[in-house]
Amino acid sequence: MSETFTIFKEITCTAATTYYTELVYTAPVGRAVIVDIRIWAVPTNTAPIGVSLWTNKEGSLDEYMPGMECYRYPLTASDALRIDRFVLEGGDRVYVSAFVDNEQGIDSKITIQVRGVA
């Protein structure tokens, strides 16, 4: 029997400083999990945002991002980072982090979402 889940991690930036958030998901031992990963910012184009994506599965992100890491500036709602149908075997881990350098002091929010079926 399959189980659908969604995990959110969100941070709101309210001052002129750097904010950082991360989400780690580990697939249940003995089960494969198919996940979709999304990272986006609101409002768009307010500050530079960097994104990192890592996994303990050797070479598994290479087809999506060579080197298993991605940095994009700026990350906006219209071109949010998306990885679809990423397969994790039981016990595999995916680590997603995002940071915003809120230079203008404008209230902004970054959200990481991992959605999947186990």
Each predicted region: which residue ranges?
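C-terminal interaction-tip segments
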Residues: 1-32, 90-91, 98-118
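Short proline/glycine- and polar residue-rich coil/turn motifs
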Residues: 13-16, 72-78
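A structural signal for the main folded, soluble domain(s) of proteins
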Residues: 27-29, 45, 71, 82-84
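Hydrophobic residues on conserved beta-strands that form the core of alpha/beta folds
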Residues: 34-36, 83
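Buried hydrophobic-core signal for structured, non-transmembrane domains
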Residues: 36-40, 94-96
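Extended, low-complexity, turn-rich repeat/linker tracts enriched in Gly/Pro/Ser/Thr and Asp/Glu
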Residues: 40-50, 99-107
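Short, surface-exposed beta-strand/strand-loop-strand elements in extracellular ectodomains
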Residues: 45-67
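Beta-sandwich interaction modules
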Residues: 74-91
